Amino acid sequence: MKKRIFLLALSFELIIIIATSVLNAKSMPEIPDIISKNKINYKTALKLHNDGKYLDAYNQFTNIINGNDEALIRDYVIYYGAKSAFYCEMFKEAIDLYSLLMKEHPRSYLYPYAEQYKALAEFYRDDYPVSNFFNGKAQKWIKEFVGLKALQKTNNKNKEIALELINRFYTKDAIIYFNNNFQKEALNLPNNIKYKMATELYEAGFRNSSLNYFNSLIKQNYNKANCLYYTARINQQENKREEAAKLFDIYLANTNNKSYRRLGLYYSADNYYKLKNTKKSISLYQTFLKEYPKDDYVPRIYNIFLNESLNANNLISAKRYLTNSLKKFPNNRWTETSLKSYLRKSLRLKNKTETYYGLKILEERHSKLRNDFILSWNIWIANEFKDFNKRDEYVLETLLTSKNPYYIKGALTLANKDMLQNVYSNNAYNMEEAKKFFADSNYSKTLEFLNKIQFIDYIATKREDKLVKEARDIAKKIFMQNKFVKDFYSKKTENEIFNELSLQTRKESNKSILLYYYGDNQNAYNEFDKIYSKTQTTYPLFYYAQKIFLNSANTKRFMQICNNIGKYFGYPYSQNVDLLPEEFRKYIYPRYFDDLVVPEAKYYKIEPEFIYSIMREESLFDSKALSWAGARGLMQLMPATARAENKKTRYKFNPLNLYDSKQNIYLGISHLSWLFQSENASNYIIFIDIEETEYYVEKVMKSYEYYSRYY
């Protein structure tokens, strides 16, 4: 049996809270409402502010301040009153309010922001020479903030401000601004400033702009060696490999060029490798190994050498590189990649000795985790060598022990009647033992035996049978002994939940909840997350976490909480998600963005469950996710892929914004459809940022199996 990864294309608002200090367990107050009924309150003033009606907002905020209302969130009232005044260019009033906030609330989350904007308001009010401000006593971060903000507002001082930021701090955003608006003047700056601008522009992704500065510096013979390195890299990244090769050669020819020699050797070797000049590439890689034997790039190079040897069916040479990598860099991911490559090639060549050599190492590396992953390799290898008895042992072990439906489904394709009967008998025994311990109120032992039950028919048919229902019913009765679960199902009113939380956290949570009910979701999140991180987790805390985190679009943070939901009632759910109550299972595997996913998936004839699986594993449903490789948004689309999809007549989003949930989902589903329809499903990984394809696919397909059963 060849090992295949099947990606299923078609199957995928508080009255003012002033009495919280007297809350105690013996006397719980009733709070019938939890927002102010005053016609003018924080909510109405904030809406005016957010709608751009700053003068009206300022007047409302100052009325609240002078009336001593909203005491619990007074720092926020003052802050947005100051900000409204600032936007009206009432700088004196803004400064007075920012000063008031800093005086009254030195520990407020808003203090540093007030400090920044107060300095900015003073800058605009005083209108003194730019150099006076930058020569002042303000801290660097204040000067940078004021400078960058002033660049967006001033017209007669922007060049001077940008130069101050560049000369003093090499501020990246100021460099980009100056380059975009005063490029001719930039080319005439002192060479040391020009070089720093070039490197900052390069790191920020403005490669062509940086190239102009590097070329200018080379002509003036300033820091020529380093400039040569950067120009070589830019040409390489722009796929101008022949020109890059020449420039790398010039740079490396002078052994005194030390600053970027390490990177120069590596990238030059990589460049020649892409040019199919293997001899030159290998020579450069060998020089790198000699000069930098402990560098993190070494296992990458070993992997290249190993694959060259494997392509030539030279297991002896490949094994030497693998051994070096295992010995010197045992925990490096490239070592793992090399091991798997060696193992696959040995198996393909039917070399039993080397196959089992590689398998033994793989087993040692994963002896404590991912046992079913190792079992899958054993099944595959035993099958390839026609050792069917051993294969069947591993199949049965998978069916009896694995909690990953992805691997169980694979094992079921090879299972015979005797194996299935073995599982059924084992399930019957475990159920009887679980019932005995449950009758004795020994709940830990009950769960122990329930966890041993393998729901293979549920996995195969996606329908709960008698066994599953009975096991889940017993588990829920055990979970209901816990206060968290009991409170979850108690159907308490929101006032009751709020009062309980006030007892647990005193004043800490009330501010965030008040902000939430007034619609200030992001600030509610900022305040509440601090509490959640340090307070014992209870149901009222979880209740408001769900409301606040989701309404502030911090879905990823809530997913991180839900992924550990079992710890709130003492059950390591990862052992068996199926035993959890339905509501808890759907917290772990939620269907967010249903209104976007379902119709689009239906249009392209792709199962929505597959889309949710990708979003869950790629971004934890975080629409602002950004990977180290540049993949963006919910489905982690690469910009080039998204631009190509956006040319289709069905879309043409303008402007294209991959952090927009709708755009990301629509373009992602469209691209998946193309991959499947063009029979490129095996290349599906190309459009996603992944380091370990095999493990990634395992996670996505595991999620798919749960989604397809829970909805």
List each model region and its residues.
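N-terminal leader/linker segments that initiate helical-solenoid repeat arrays
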Residues: 23-62, 71-76, 145, 156, ...
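Short solvent-exposed coil/turn linkers within tandem alpha-helical repeat scaffolds
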Residues: 32-35, 64-74, 101-113, 133-146, ...
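Alpha-helical segment of the N-proximal tetratricopeptide repeat
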Residues: 39-63, 161-164, 168-169, 196-206, ...
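Residue at a conserved register position within TPR or TPR-like alpha-solenoid repeats
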Residues: 48, 85, 122, 165, ...
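Structural motif corresponding to the intra-repeat A-B loop/turn of tetratricopeptide repeats
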Residues: 51, 88, 125, 168, ...
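Single-residue signature of alpha-solenoid repeat helices
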Residues: 57, 94, 130-131, 174, ...
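Catalytic glycan-binding domains that act on GlcNAc-containing polysaccharides
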Residues: 300, 312-315, 337, 349-352, ...
